[in-house]
Amino acid sequence: NGLCQDSVVYRDLFDTKLMGLLTPRPSAVIRRFWDLYAESPKAATDDYYAFSKTTNYIRADRLAKDAKWITPTPYGDMDITINLSKPEKDPKAIAAALQMKQSAYPKCQLCKENEGYAGRVNHPARQNHRIIPLEMGGGPWFLQYSPYGYYNEHCIVFNGRHTPMKIDRSAFQKLFDFVEKFPHYFVGSNADLPIVGGSILTHEHFQGGHYTFAMTKAPIETAYAFAGYKDIEAGIVKWPMSVLRLRGDEPARICDLADKVLQAWRGYTDPDAFIYAETDGTPHNTITPIARCRNGK
């Protein structure tokens, strides 16, 4: 009835504006989260996830369109997902965006400034978006959920500063800082190399959630012992790709060994196996670290 243009982009801008009027202010959401956290971390995330769906920040009606199933394989029961929930790009909105004055605010869709942002045709509205402040690695980080989650309670943890992705020892420590706060969640990082793709490399962030994937349940195929790290259980996981699992009681010790492995792998070249550490100055070797707490380890 003429309140907005009849396209997905403009309807999303409009309904998010309406929901923003009903969404509690950030301070109230943060206070409720930490009050519940005092009872248990799971109580806090359960409530925050339900809240994010109630405000329509997580568009559950669209997520229901995704095709998901589990199929048995020699490596365990694999989760297969076909993402059908993200709306198609609207040609009219694309044309309108080309005519708009370019904006560098927010710097990206992960920046904390997205909370409460009105949006535009080429940047989603976030008036119904609320984020939870955390401390990780001695600095300010924030927790939110993915509006288009691929699994249960698919969360995003992002740096309070707009700083690039980087896999190093400090990244490992931040992952452990998170699972110590939320032991029922796993958390991991995408690779930090442009050639891999699939991530926003300009803003440091991790992804996690409340789900158990097949790789988590996969057994150790070949056990290894690292000199000087007898307290760390290590081994190659039975998986179609190269996966090294490290397990121990002390996060700092695991971080030390993981960093040692990372540094060795970054410079590793084996032409016979078609593995090159770099070509024309472009690095090729990195890892995708994932942290979780299982049975106290």
Predicted regions and their residues:
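Structured alpha-helical segments in the cores of large, soluble enzyme domains
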Residues: 141-147, 171, 175-179, 225-232
